[in-house]
Amino acid sequence: FMYIIEKERGENSNCSVIVNLDKGEIEIYAEKEIVDDLEDPVLEILLEEANKAMPEEKFEVGDIFVEVIDPRIFGRRMINTAKQFFNQRLQDVEKHYIYEDYSQRIGEIVIGVVHQVQRDNIFINIEQAELRLPKKEQIHSERYRRGDSIRTIVKSVEVNPRGPEIIVSRSDNHFLYKMFEMEVPEIEDGIIEILAIARHPGERSKIIVKSQDRRIDPVGACVGMRGSRIQAIVRELSNEKIDIINNSEQSEILISRALSPAKPIDLYIDDDRKYCVALFNDDELEFAIGRGGVNI
């Protein structure tokens, strides 16, 4: 708006603009010095005219008179140009705010509404922000429709010419971690630690947990009374089976627990080279590997 005013009245017009976003109103004011002899009508006003316009003020020469300018004097084309420029600037500010906001929320769970479902992407709205859930970040068995509520984790935020691109995920391991953090207070408080996660999203997950307090069973705390905590997570993940494994300082015990329900005949562990060879009967091999190699 100042560009239009300066173009119409000059750069030194002593004008100010107030924009009321809630009401969609624009107010333009021009400060003029009150004089006896008018030389510059843009910057000055005669004492007689000032007192006539606002007799209650009783102006004197040298005072400042604030004139209210009707935006319509600039013409429809100029006003439309100003509106377009203002709207563009408003969008730029909004995009910057969204980028800054979600850049600080990477790794957090957010809840939005499905806006559009495409073959390779699901677009989610949260207030003014649009989030993209790519196919590879989805749980393959899930189907969503426009208007559905959906919980995801913010994975990354990038800038492109159209504005911030916010990528979210439901298949990421950290999504499972945050779900446990939400449902198990002992994890949020740091009493129980999740050491590792292996997932085949929507099918099966295995997590290794450790308690910092010997009095608290980490597996029992994660499962909850009558399975209340773990079932809340399983339902959110479309009945994904979740195995919770108690950590052990002994490699043989930990590996055997991780390979369950398969039972190895023998284990050959090289702690220095950090690898293990496990032997199984043929009928146990498929269970040992797990769907998608989740046990490996």
Predicted regions span which residues?
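RNA-contacting regions in translation and RNA-metabolism proteins
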Residues: 1-295
